[in-house]
């Protein structure tokens, strides 16, 4: 049950398999995109990654294109808004992961790291000295949280312990305000066992037990365990409220809902489900607004436009919505009809 990521019908896999070459980036000089519709809550700014039908990935700061590049792997990225620096990953022809630093003012691009590892879910530390990311190694079946030192250009393992080959991190979130983490983790052995049993019986697999934890660097405290399919996690600035996307699966039919867990009481409730106007994605990526009064998330709008990429695969356009916790109302926040949103962040 390793983290499921749905792109333009898995164009990432197609690109990697085809050995897509690395292209020199075209800098758009903070070009505004006419097709982008933005309607964020007051004071909020979004960082959005989107891939179009030509497999060109663009990075937006609200409605401004701050960078674009040919897709070579799943786009993982983080923005230092104060210094106007974009950190992002991309693979080369040998399928090696590379971490780049792009100065958005001078347009200077620097490769910080190259290796056989995989990296996703990039977060910039509070003091801007470190990139936290989810690490995957070819010789391990589990995923980890690691910290990349921007000065030494080396990374170190944070969680789980280096000798632990069973515990795997399916998703994590870094709270820059409190310099803290929230994460989802589970047992690889349990997951394989349940998958094998389901295959033998020809039935849908039972969800692997997902454990919630939070803390700082090397000290994480367990919060709760649930037997549900859960794909992502995010926290409020005060670390008291935790958002996650849970979904059920019956055959090929998947139904998602966004839940909120109280870190103190350990109780949780469903707060967002499918509506007449949209269908939630199973990786809805819910996140709090800066004031904590709204929740941003990904969904497919009713009648969403279908796109076909250069490989012939089809997918529907995704939309970022917001939900008011006070008024219980929804609104469209960010949409581009010419590409598929990979992921987004509320900029701190």
UniProtKB/Swiss-Prot annotation:
Cystine residue pairs: none
Keywords of the record: Signal
Entry annotated with the keyword Iron: no
Signal peptide interval: 1-26
Coiled coil: none
InterPro entries membership: PD40, WD40/YVTN_repeat-like_dom_sf
PANTHER family to which the protein is assigned, alphabetical: PROTEIN TOLB (PTHR36842:SF1), PROTEIN TOLB HOMOLOG (PTHR36842)
Record's protein name: Uncharacterized protein YdjN
Source organism per UniProt: Bacillus subtilis (strain 168)
Lineage: Bacteria, Bacillati, Bacillota, Bacilli, Bacillales
Originating gene: ydjN
């Amino acid at each position: 049950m390793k983290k499921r990521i749905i792109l333009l019908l898995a164009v990432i896999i197609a690109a990697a398999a085809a050995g897509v070459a690395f292209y020199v980036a075209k800098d758009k000089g903070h070009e505004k995109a006419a097709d982008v519709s933005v309607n964020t809550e007051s004071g909020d700014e979004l960082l959005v990654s989107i891939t179009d039908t030509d497999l060109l990935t663009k990075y937006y700061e609200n409605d401004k294109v701050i960078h674009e590049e040919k897709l070579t792997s799943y786009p993982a990225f983080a923005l230092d808004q104060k210094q106007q620096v974009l950190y992002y990953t991309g693979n080369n022809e040998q399928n090696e992961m590379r971490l780049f630093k792009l100065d958005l003012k001078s347009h200077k691009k620097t490769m910080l790291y190259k290796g056989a590892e995989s990296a996703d879910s990039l977060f910039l530390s509070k003091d801007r000295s470190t990139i936290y990311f989810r690490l995957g190694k070819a010789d391990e079946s589990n995923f980890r949280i690691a910290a990349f030192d921007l000065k030494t250009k080396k990374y170190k393992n944070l969680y789980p312990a280096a000798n632990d080959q069973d515990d795997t991190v399916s998703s994590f979130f870094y709270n820059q305000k409190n310099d803290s983490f929230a994460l989802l983790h589970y047992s690889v052995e349990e997951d394989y066992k349940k998958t094998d049993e389901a295959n033998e019986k020809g039935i849908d697999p039972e969800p692997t037990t997902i454990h919630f934890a939070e803390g700082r660097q090397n000290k994480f405290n367990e919060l709760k365990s649930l037997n549900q399919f859960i794909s992502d996690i995010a926290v409020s600035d005060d670390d008291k409220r935790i958002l996650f996307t849970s979904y059920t699966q019956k055959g090929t039919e998947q139904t998602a809902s966004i839940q909120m867990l109280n870190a103190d009481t350990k109780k949780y409730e469903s707060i967002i489900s499918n509506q007449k106007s949209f269908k939630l994605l199973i990786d809805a990526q819910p996140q709090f607004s800066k004031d904590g009064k709204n929740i941003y998330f990904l969904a497919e709008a009713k009648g969403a436009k279908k796109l076909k990429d250069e490989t012939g695969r089809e997918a529907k356009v995704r939309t970022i919505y917001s939900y008011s916790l006070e008024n219980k109302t929804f609104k469209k926040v960010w949409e581009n009809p010419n590409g598929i949103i990979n992921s987004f962040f509320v900029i701190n």
